[in-house]
Each structure stands twice: as structure tokens, then as C-alpha cells.
Amino acid sequence: MLTYGIDVSANNPEDAPGSMPGMSFVMIKATEGHTYVSPTQKAQATAARRHGRAVGFYHFLWPGNIGLQAHHFVEKCASTPGDILAVDWEQTTDNTHASNAEKD
């Protein structure tokens, strides 16, 4: 059996987590780098929970000072006990990414 989910960010409507039928979970972008905080993460989590979806939050990782970014994510994420926390490790908009050494 497959489980379907979506990931959303501030680029999606606040009610996006509830607007797609058949989704079991929603991963919500909470933070990026060491300064950005999503202004829609709380509303998106509320919408997901209202529709019975499991909720997770992710941090978009930039190269450099991974410890500071991890602290920023934990401090600013709108998670509650039982939510999933994850890191989105991919190429950034300026074509860079955290190295394997930084990631580990």
C-alpha cells in the first residue's frame, strides 16, 4: 500500500494541506538558512491537522554553519510533539549546496 503526501511552503496557499484529497501527510517548510522563517507554517499545519493529516516540518539547508541552522530550525519551527522534523538538502537558488561533510 502506498502512502501519499505533499510538501508545501509559503509559495502555497495556507489551506493547501487540506485542499488535496488522498494525502496522508504534509511536510511544511518552516525555515531556510539561518534567518528565514515561513510566515505560513502555523496556518498550514492547522489546515493539515484539521483534515486529519500527519504533519512534518522541514528546513531548507544552505551551505555553512550547519549548527546555527539546526538551532534556528528547532527554535522557529511550529512543530508539536509527534511531528516529523526533516532537512531538505538540495541545490540552492545560487547553485550551491551543503557538502557531505557539512551534512554529516
Regions found by a protein language model. Give the residues of each.
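Substrate-binding cleft of extracellular glycoside hydrolase catalytic domains
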Residues: M1-D104
